[in-house]
């Protein structure tokens, strides 16, 4: 069983500054019974990678064509003469149509709201994804419901659509040693709800003087700044 995973363009498959998708894929690959048959493809400038089963797609800068389209085209070229059983795409539904020339099963993973993404915003686009993918995986029932909005009932029964909840390693927790601490971990942008968290946490900390909050993460593309004496923003860890 040979599996190729195409990361979102510019996603860093590196322990130095990984994206959420890279962290998820690295964790799953280490546990997979097919881990020796999996190859991850991406495009990053960072030298240190999570694993050796990674191929970096090198691109030349061009103002005349889409870097994303060029990225996917290079991936297709690498697979034209390969016998790959499954191609995995994460959070980039618009990549699927560019892969139709490859006679390979395609699995699409949604880690966020499908109707907010290029390639799955309209009912027509989502119907095409169902037609072209062997399986579409959601990380929650909510994201699956979002995907099915305005689609005929027949699509709601499709066996191609499946929910697989993300998980973490189970740790022993001593309930008696609870702290009055609220934590936010993730990208500090509105897509992840940090704008709502920030406004809410300021109200909570003002009302409950003995509570504290810790924020772990960053977001260079969107600046959402919240300040409070009991709020610590630690940045990317």
Identify the residue ranges that each predicted region occupies.
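A short, active-site helix/loop in glycosyltransferases that binds the activated sugar's phosphate group
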Residues: 119, 131-160, 170
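Conserved donor-binding/catalytic core segment of Leloir-type glycosyltransferases
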Residues: 4-6, 137, 174-192, 196-202, ...
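Short His-centered aromatic/hydrophobic patch
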Residues: 89-95, 110
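Glycosyltransferase donor-sugar binding loop
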Residues: 198, 211-225
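Short beta-strand->alpha-helix junction loop in the catalytic core
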Residues: 114, 142-143, 160-172, 220
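Nucleotide-sugar donor phosphate/pyrophosphate-binding loop at the beta->alpha transition
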Residues: 70, 112-132, 170
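N-terminal strand-loop element at the rim of the active site
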Residues: 6-15, 24-67, 157-160, 219-221
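Nucleotide-activated donor-binding/catalytic signature segment of Leloir-type glycosyltransferases, i.e.
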Residues: 222-237
